[in-house]
Structure formats: structure tokens, C-alpha cells
């Protein structure tokens, strides 16, 4: 079975495809650094590095030949669908998803599906995708796929922790096919603590604590050097908690950020939050300044630690500066999250082949 990976990024879905037994025919990525990472980790996969708006079916066919495409996967960049993305608009009540140019890439994904006619498509995005315009936007997207013959569409919000990822990350998965198959999602494999169901959620400790003391010894495991005042503040954040500004002594409570209106340090929830070794992580937000604090050390996570939480193997190398690495890691789909859904697609495709 073969697949195409659009908006491939650093290769989270490509890795999941590979682990699920698919042959990756080609990938597409516009960002040079992301593409460099993808080429390094998938050297045999042809990659078109350009804006998908200018990628044609003829160009793709020149790479892959006349083979039948079984599956197209991809996560169109989602800034316009996310809570953080919508905050860029002064009045979010007036926000129109159809007018946000960051959302147009979804239509390019649909165009490629239309032109290549895969048997299945797999599209992922932030959970906010389903709420835009009171749910009308996602229905419009579904209707566009249905107009192409993809009448069987499954669309749900999925929690990564439910499938063994040490992270409570929520994503929208939309899976459709033109074979008349009612897609049944894979059964949940892990369960929240305290429910009595086993196995329980995978936690941060087993994922990253063996990396302590190995800084700068393995790829992408380079700590950010914090200012002394920031490192000192981290010392007041208890494991599994956010910073309580009232706990800081006066000399540490003085703001160092130019945008502070109060003169005191603010509790930026995505910055001053320490992970708990005995619980899954919160969502890995892209960017080296957005990663949470290490469970036991007074620093934020390294790109490698974040990649572990995203379920990338240590053999998967991220190119570029530390900041570029962290953006790649934070943007990626956790391979272990997508893999069971892709395996299920592969099973349907194999059964369809047997029925011929």
C-alpha cells in the first residue's frame, strides 16, 4: 500500500506511515529547514519543496508514475483554526474563517485529493477546526470531499494519551474514503489514572528521565541557557504546577519583560509550568520559549526531550537551530498517535484488495 504526505513537516506522519507498513511515494513541504529534516530521515522519499498552491498533479505524477494512490495524508497549517491563531484578530467575534488566508491551504489539500483520487484520505488539524463558524466550516470541508465521491467520512477529536503518547494533546482526525467503507477507529489503548482501567496513561518520567546527565551527548539534546533570574524563578515552580507569582521573593518578582504593565512577572501558563513525572505532559507548543519546565531541573525541555514526549525515536534527527528544532517538534503529529489509525486504513485497503 502506498501513500503521499502533504505538509510533511519534520515527518511525524511519514514516520507513522512507515511504521504502519505504507510505502511513501512522495512528500511536500514548503519550509526549507523542515524539508531538510524530512530528507535526512527519509532519504529515499522524493520531496517537492515548494508552496502547495503551485504543486500540480502533473508534477506529482512525474515523480510517482501512474500508480494508484491508496492514501493521502496531511495536516494543512492550522494557525487560523487555533485559539492562539484567532487571537491575532482584535475582535474574534468578527472572525471569518473563510477570509483568513491561513485557512486556504485546506482547500489546496482538497484540490490534490481531487486530482489524484486516492482511495482514502487522512487529514489532521487542531481541535478548534471543528468549532469554527459554529461548526459550519468543518461541514463545508466535509461536503467538498463528499462532492468528490468521498461519502464515508469519520471525523473526531482524538487525545494522544489514549493511544500511548505521554502527552494530553488533542487533534482533529478526519478520515474519508470513496470505497463505501464505514471507518471504525481503533480501540483506545490507554486510560486516565484513577479509572481502574489498564494500562494507564503513559507518563513523562519513563519518556525522558533517562536523558538527565546526557545533555549535549545525543542529537538535539541541548539545553537552553536561561538568564539567572529566570532559572531562579523556575526553582519556585513545584513539580506538576504552574508558577504562583506570590511565592516569589521581591527581587524575583520584578518584571524583566518590556510588555509588563504591572511591573511584576506574569504567569505565562505555557512558560512557567513544570511537568510531573507521574502524569502525561501538556501539549508541546511549538517554539523553544514555549516548552514546559523539566520535572526536576530548572530549565525548559530540550528539543530531544520534547521529541521523546512526541514519541519520536532518538534516531530521528531535527535540523537547524535550537529554535527551529523546537518548532519542528512542536508542530509535528505524534507518530504513535497517528499510527493505529493508519494501520486501520491499511487493513481496510488490504481487505478491499482481497475482495477483487
Where are these regions (language model features)?
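C-terminal target-recognition/interaction regions appended to catalytic cores
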Residues: 224-356
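S-adenosyl-L-methionine
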Residues: 36-64
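Extreme N-terminal starter segment of soluble prokaryotic enzymes
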Residues: 1-3
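Conserved SAM-binding loop of SAM-dependent methyltransferases across substrates and taxa
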Residues: 10-20
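Conserved proline-anchored active-site loop of SAM-dependent methyltransferases
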Residues: 5-12, 66-88, 120-125, 174-178, ...
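Short beta-strand element of Class I
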Residues: 24-25
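Conserved SAM/SAH-binding beta-strand->alpha-helix loop
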Residues: 31
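Class I S-adenosyl-L-methionine
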Residues: 59-67, 83-265
Amino acid at each position: 500500500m502506498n501513500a503521499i504526505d502533504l505538509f510533511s513537516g519534520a515527518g511525524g506522519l511519514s514516520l507513522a506511515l512507515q511504521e504502519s507498513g505504507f510505502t511513501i511515494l512522495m512528500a511536500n513541504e514548503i519550509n526549507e529547514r523542515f524539508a531538510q529534516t524530512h530528507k535526512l530521515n527519509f532519504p529515499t522519499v522524493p520531496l517537492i519543496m515548494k508552496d502547495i498552491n503551485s504543486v500540480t498533479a502533473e508534477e506529482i505524477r512525474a515523480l510517482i508514475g501512474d500508480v494508484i494512490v491508496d492514501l493521502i495524508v496531511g495536516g494543512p497549517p492550522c494557525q487560523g483554526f487555533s485559539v492562539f491563531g484567532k487571537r491575532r484578530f482584535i475582535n474574534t467575534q468578527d472572525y471569518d474563517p473563510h477570509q483568513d488566508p491561513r485557512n486556504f491551504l485546506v482547500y489546496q489539500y482538497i484540490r490534490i485529493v481531487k486530482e489524484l483520487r486516492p482511495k482514502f484520505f487522512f487529514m489532521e488539524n487542531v481541535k478548534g477546526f471543528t468549532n469554527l463558524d459554529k461548526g459550519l466550516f468543518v461541514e463545508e470541508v466535509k461536503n467538498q470531499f463528499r462532492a468528490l465521491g468521498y461519502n464515508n467520512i469519520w471525523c473526531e477529536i482524538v487525545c494522544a494519551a489514549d493511544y500511548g503518547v505521554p502527552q494530553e494533546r488533542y487533534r482533529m482526525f478526519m478520515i474519508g474514503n470513496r470505497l463505501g467503507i464505514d471507518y471504525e477507529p481503533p480501540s483506545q489503548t490507554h486510560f486516565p489514572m484513577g479509572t481502574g482501567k489498564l494500562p494507564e496513561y503513559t507518563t513523562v518520567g519513563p519518556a525522558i528521565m533517562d536523558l538527565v546527565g546526557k545533555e549535549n551527548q545525543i542529537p538535539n539534546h541541548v539545553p537552553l541557557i536561561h538568564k539567572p533570574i529566570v532559572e531562579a524563578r523556575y526553582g519556585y515552580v513545584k513539580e506538576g504546577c504552574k508558577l504562583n507569582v506570590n511565592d516569589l521573593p521581591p527581587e524575583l518578582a520584578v518584571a524583566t519583560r518590556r510588555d509588563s504593565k504591572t511591573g511584576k512577572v506574569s504567569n505565562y501558563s505555557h512558560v512557567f509550568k513544570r511537568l510531573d513525572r507521574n502524569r502525561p505532559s501538556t501539549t508541546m507548543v511549538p517554539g523553544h520559549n514555549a516548552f514546559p519546565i523539566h520535572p526536576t531541573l530548572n530549565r525548559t525541555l530540550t528539543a530531544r526531550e520534547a521529541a521523546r514526549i512526541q514519541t519520536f525515536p532518538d534516531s530521528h534527527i531535527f535540523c537547524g537551530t535550537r529554535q527551529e528544532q523546537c518548532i519542528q517538534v512542536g508542530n509535528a503529529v505524534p507518530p504513535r498517535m497517528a499510527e493505529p489509525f493508519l494501520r486501520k486504513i491499511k487493513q481496510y485497503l488490504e481487505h478491499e484488495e482481497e475482495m477483487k
